[in-house]
């Protein structure tokens, strides 16, 4: 199967750079799968796991918080606010963050920033999904 170059970049570092057969990410309209020779595309990404299929059934998963994905020729670039590989994730901290966000959303504080609590919950859920 043909391959494409994939890079996942944050403001701090290059999180992943390598060859892949497919990239699966969550855009605003749902999951999108990119394979070699895909038409050019730029799309915003939601906070969610990104899966990079490297060869056969091997896969690299990471938790990505926001950003954009650009597809040009045989290159996919993900520019993300944050991107964490499973080994970078503190599972206990992610569980605590999920619990805090869920508590905030159910208790309805008067000055609650609902969008912020929802984003925190999405980040925690993505981290926990990737760390499995």
UniProtKB/Swiss-Prot annotation:
One Pfam family linked to the record = ATP-synt_DE_N
Q: Where in the cell is it found?
A: Cell membrane
Q: Which GO terms describe its molecular function?
A: ATP binding; proton-transporting ATP synthase activity, rotational mechanism
Q: Which domain of life is it from?
A: Bacteria
Q: Does the keyword Hydrolase apply?
A: no
Has the keyword Iron been applied to this entry?
Answer: no
Main subcellular location:
membrane
For this UniProt record, the keywords arranged alphabetically read as follows: ATP synthesis, Cell membrane, CF(1), Hydrogen ion transport, Ion transport, Membrane, Transport
* Gene Ontology cellular component terms for the protein in this record: plasma membrane; proton-transporting ATP synthase complex
How does the protein associate with the membrane? Peripheral membrane protein
Subunit composition and interactions: F-type ATPases have 2 components, CF(1) - the catalytic core - and CF(0) - the membrane proton channel. CF(1) has five subunits: alpha(3), beta(3), gamma(1), delta(1), epsilon(1). CF(0) has three main subunits: a, b and c.
What does the similarity note say? Belongs to the ATPase epsilon chain family.
Q: What does this protein do?
A: Produces ATP from ADP in the presence of a proton gradient across the membrane.
- Record's protein name: ATP synthase epsilon chain
- Native source species: Brevibacillus brevis (strain 47 / JCM 6285 / NBRC 100599)
């Amino acid at each position: 199967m043909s391959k494409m170059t994939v890079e996942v970049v944050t403001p701090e570092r290059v999180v992943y750079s390598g060859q892949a057969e497919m990239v699966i990410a969550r855009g605003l309209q749902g999951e999108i799968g990119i394979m070699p020779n895909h038409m050019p595309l730029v799309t915003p990404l939601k906070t969610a796991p990104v899966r990079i299929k490297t060869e056969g059934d091997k896969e690299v998963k990471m938790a990505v918080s926001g950003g954009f994905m650009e597809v040009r020729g045989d290159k996919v670039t993900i520019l993300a606010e944050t991107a964490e590989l499973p080994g970078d994730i503190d599972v206990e901290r992610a569980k605590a963050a999920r619990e805090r966000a869920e508590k905030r959303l159910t208790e309805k504080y008067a000055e609650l920033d609902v969008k912020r609590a929802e984003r925190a919950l999405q980040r925690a859920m993505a981290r926990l999904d990737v760390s499995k």
